[in-house]
Structure formats: C-alpha cells, structure tokens
C-alpha cells in the first residue's frame, strides 16, 4: 500500500478493526492506542444501550450468509444518511456480529471483519474524510449526549429489524415506545 491508501487503511484499522478485536477479547484495553481508548468509551456506551433494548441474534453458518446479512443491514442503515452516530452503530453491529461468530466457534469472524472493513472503505470513508476524519469522530465521541446515542440506537434497531424481518424485535421496540 502506498500514500493515500495507507492512510485510509490506518484510519479504518484505528476506528473499526481495533474496536472489533477489543470487543472479541482478542486484545486488551491496554493494547488500544490512546485514540482507540477514547472512542471505545462511546462505542461501549452504544453497545450498552443497544444491549438494554434488544438481544441481537444471528443465524450464520457460512461466509456468504454473513456477507448477505451484514451488507443488507448496513446498506439499509446508511441508505438515506451517513452521520457519526450511525457509524458508531455500524461499528458496534460489526463487533457484535464478529463476536457472535467467534463464540459460535464457526471461524467466520474474519469474514465479518473483512466485510465491515470493505464496507467502511468503499461506502463510509469518503464521507468520514470530508467531515473531519478521525479528529471529528473523536470530537463526536467525546461530546455525544445520551439523547443522540438513544436516537441513533433506535434508528439502527428499526433498520436492523426491518431488514431481518424480526417481528418479535419490532414488537418489543414498539412496546417500549422506541419506534
């Protein structure tokens, strides 16, 4: 890799891959860079809020199912707008899916990481760079309030549930007045 592509690769590794590896317990908090430790705080908060709202389960047995389900959910998530909150939801969703694969011992977590990496590179990175890159993402993560986190989690869940046709999930969200 050279020049600009190397910079992009480093941004994705810093923001996405590092958190996924941390979430899967492949690296410890002490192995995260100072930047990753800062964004980990907001991503952990997103994950906790998401976890309180619904348990996301997957039915994934092969690489093609992962690519299809992952791409469907995140395409729906970003079809009308990209923003830092949705990017946080994307990263947390990616980490959860990778951890599910690791815990299921089906050795497909690398497929999730590669699919998430490629999606971010081709679909999100241009927007991220034009909106301040890592510095602006860090600023967002340091200054987000609970209302923006909850709003983005509700939006993410509505897109996830619509794509995955999880009627019970949608009903749960409606019962909790979340969608």
Swiss-Prot record:
The lineage of its organism: Viruses, Varidnaviria, Bamfordvirae, Nucleocytoviricota, Pokkesviricetes. It is found in: Host mitochondrion; Host endoplasmic reticulum. One of its GO terms (cellular component) is host cell mitochondrion. The keyword Transferase does not apply. The keyword Iron-sulfur does not apply. GO terms for biological process: regulation of apoptotic process; symbiont-mediated suppression of host apoptosis. Keywords: Apoptosis, Early protein, Host endoplasmic reticulum, Host mitochondrion, Host-virus interaction, Inhibition of host apoptosis by viral BCL2-like protein, Late protein, Modulation of host cell apoptosis by virus. InterPro entries: Bcl-2-like_sf, Bcl-2_BH1-3, Bcl-2_fam, Bcl2-like, Bcl2_BH1_motif_CS, Bcl2_BH2_motif_CS. A motif (BH1) lies at residues 76-95. Suppresses apoptosis in host cell to promote the viral replication. Has the ability to potentially bind to all the members of the proapoptotic Bcl-2 family. Inhibits autophagy by interacting with host Beclin 1 (BECN1). Pfam families: Bcl-2 (PF00452). GO terms for molecular function: BH domain binding. Its main location: host cell. Belongs to the Bcl-2 family. Interacts with host BECN1 (via BH3 homology domain); this interaction allows the virus to inhibit BECN1, and thus autophagy. Interacts with host BID. Interacts with host BAX. Induction: Expressed in the early phase of the viral replicative cycle. Expressed in the late phase of the viral replicative cycle. Signal peptide: none annotated. A motif (BH2) lies at residues 126-141. It comes from the Viruses. This is Apoptosis regulator Bcl-2 homolog. PANTHER family: BCL-2 BCL-2 HOMOLOGY REGION 1-3 DOMAIN-CONTAINING PROTEIN, BCL-2 RELATED.
């Amino acid at each position: 890799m050279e020049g600009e592509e190397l910079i992009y690769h480093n941004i994705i590794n810093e923001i996405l891959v590092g958190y996924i590896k941390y979430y899967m317990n492949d690296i410890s908090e002490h192995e995260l860079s100072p930047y990753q430790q800062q964004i980990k705080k907001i991503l952990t908060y997103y994950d906790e809020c998401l976890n309180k709202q619904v348990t996301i389960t997957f039915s994934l047995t092969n690489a093609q199912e992962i690519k299809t389900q992952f791409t469907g959910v995140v395409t729906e998530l970003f079809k009308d707008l990209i923003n830092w909150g949705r990017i946080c939801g994307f990263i947390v969703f990616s980490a959860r899916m990778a951890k599910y694969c690791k815990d299921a011992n089906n050795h497909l977590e690398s497929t999730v990481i590669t699919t998430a990496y490629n999606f971010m590179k081709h679909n999100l990175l241009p927007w991220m760079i034009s909106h301040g890159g890592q510095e602006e993402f860090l600023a967002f993560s340091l200054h987000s309030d609970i209302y923006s986190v909850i709003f983005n989690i509700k939006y993410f869940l509505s897109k996830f549930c619509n794509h995955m046709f999880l009627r019970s999930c949608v009903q749960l969200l409606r019962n909790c007045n979340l969608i």
